[in-house]
Each structure stands twice: as structure tokens, then as C-alpha cells.
């Protein structure tokens, strides 16, 4: 049985300025996204479906900047609304206290979508092409975020059989019982595995929106599965149908991804050509 090392959340102290590990993992996440995005620019399946205007590194940097804003603002608001609405409605100024923790992936996803809608319109880029470009680059950032959760010893898993070789005691939980290291499970499922699947899937020409759909389904399934090993939020517990809030929020992602993939498969592309395998009707 393992014991979490209880790492100091402050990685570096520069006078009055404390640099936290979690902040560094966010920087790592954005750096990995930028690296992945620049690699994506070199892939023929992406270049071959470019819309008006050529993509450049400046586009990637601006897109990342807006994405960061979407992640932070959407992630914070999502946590406040999805997980502690009563508290934050009674204490609205606490919403601004981001340094106290509390972010939601599902809220961050909505924030990113809104920011990229604005980016697509101002740069005359096809929205779904943009989202398909982003999707394979997201999981590595998610993996970095889960690494930050593990370093902080937060979001630990449910009780595990002590005989499980990787069962771990998290001193921060205060229980002293061995638990699943669910942060690592999520790092592997939502991060590494999902990245590999999406990267390989996106290497071939796909209809617009299908890579985005694959991300929604893939993340939703990975998160839904990992939630069975993650300790539910203490103030929420297990909800209806014995599911956690994370699972309930993942269901719309899975269903939305399936519907989006079907829609992309059956609709004519933006150039007016029918989907593969169909001929235009006689007029």
C-alpha cells in the first residue's frame, strides 16, 4: 500500500510571491497545447480543409489566448453554478477568489466554445474546422491538470481494497484508508489514452465536426468511467441513479457527441457536395 507524499503545493517562493505547482501544471497544459497545435498545422488532413485565409502561428497564439480566458472564466463559473450554486449566490464576490480553488472542466469547455465562436467569426474561419483542429490538442492539457490534482493530493478516489498494489492513502482526506489514485486514472483515460485515439483518428480526412464529436464522446465516456473510482464531492455526494455530478454532466457530452457525429455524417459539406457515398439528387 502506498502513501501520498503530501507534496508542498508551493513549488517556489520568491519573496512574497508563491508559485504553486497547480499553476505550473496549467502553464504546462497551455505549452503542450501550443506545441500540439503547431504540429497539427503540418498535417495534410487539416491543411486540405482550410477555409478562407491561410493559418499562421499568430492565429494559433491568439486562439490559445482566448482559449485560456475561456478555460479560466468558464471553468470558474461552471464550478460555482454546477457544484456550489447556493454558496456563491449568497456570496457572489467569492466567485472572484480563483486562488482558493474550484474549477470545472465542463464549465471550462463551455467557455472555450464561446471564445472560439468569437475567434472564428472575427477571423472568418469555419467554426467546426476550428474545433476539429483544437480537439486532439486538448487531452494533453487535461493530463497536466490531473497531474496538478495529484501533486496537491486533492480529488482523491474512493476506498480501495488494501491488497490493490497501487492503493494509496491520502493524508489530506483525513480518513487514513487506502484509496484509488483516481487523479492518475483520469490522467491516463482523459489525457493519454484520449490523446492517442483522437490524434490517430484526426490523421485521416474526416467530415467537419466529426473530430469534435469524437472528443465529446471520448471524454464523456472516460470521465463517466473514472467517476466510479473518484470520491464524490462531500457537499453533493451520490445523486440520482447512484451517479455523481461528474457523471451527470458527462451524459449530455456523450449524447451531444453522438448526435453531432451523425449530423456531420449526413449533411452536405460547406462546399455543397454531398457526404461520402451519396450522389446529389436530380433537379
Q: Model segments located where?
A:
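Hydrophobic, membrane-interfacing alpha helices
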Residues: 1-283
Amino acid at each position: 500500500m502506498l502513501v501520498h507524499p503530501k507534496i508542498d503545493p508551493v513549488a517556489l517562493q520568491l519573496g512574497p510571491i508563491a508559485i504553486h505547482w497547480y499553476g505550473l501544471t496549467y502553464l504546462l497544459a497551455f505549452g503542450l497545447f501550443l506545441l500540439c497545435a503547431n504540429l497539427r498545422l503540418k498535417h495534410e488532413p487539416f491543411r486540405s480543409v482550410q477555409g478562407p485565409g491561410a493559418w499562421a502561428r499568430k492565429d494559433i497564439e491568439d486562439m490559445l489566448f482566448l482559449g485560456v480566458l475561456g478555460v479560466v472564466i468558464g471553468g470558474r463559473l461552471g464550478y460555482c453554478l454546477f457544484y456550489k450554486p447556493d454558496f456563491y449566490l449568497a456570496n457572489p464576490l467569492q466567485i472572484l477568489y480563483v486562488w482558493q480553488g474550484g474549477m470545472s472542466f465542463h464549465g471550462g469547455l463551455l467557455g472555450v466554445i464561446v471564445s472560439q465562436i468569437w475567434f472564428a467569426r472575427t477571423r472568418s474561419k469555419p467554426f467546426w474546422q476550428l474545433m476539429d483542429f483544437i480537439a486532439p490538442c486538448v487531452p494533453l492539457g487535461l493530463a497536466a491538470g490531473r497531474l496538478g490534482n495529484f501533486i496537491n493530493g486533492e480529488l482523491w478516489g474512493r476506498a480501495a481494497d488494501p491488497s490493490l498494489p497501487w492503493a494509496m492513502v491520502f493524508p489530506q482526506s483525513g480518513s487514513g484508508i487506502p484509496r484509488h489514485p483516481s487523479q492518475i486514472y483520469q490522467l491516463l483515460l482523459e489525457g493519454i489514452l484520449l490523446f492517442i485515439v483522437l490524434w490517430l483518428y484526426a490523421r485521416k480526412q474526416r467530415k467537419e465536426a466529426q473530430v469534435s464529436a469524437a472528443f465529446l464522446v471520448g471524454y464523456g465516456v472516460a470521465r463517466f468511467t473514472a467517476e466510479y473510482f473518484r470520491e464524490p464531492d462531500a457537499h453533493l455526494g451520490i445523486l440520482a441513479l447512484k451517479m455523481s455530478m461528474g457523471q451527470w454532466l458527462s451524459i449530455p457530452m456523450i449524447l451531444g457527441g453522438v448526435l453531432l457525429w451523425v449530423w456531420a455524417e449526413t449533411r452536405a459539406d460547406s462546399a455543397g457536395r454531398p457526404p461520402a457515398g451519396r450522389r446529389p439528387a436530380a433537379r
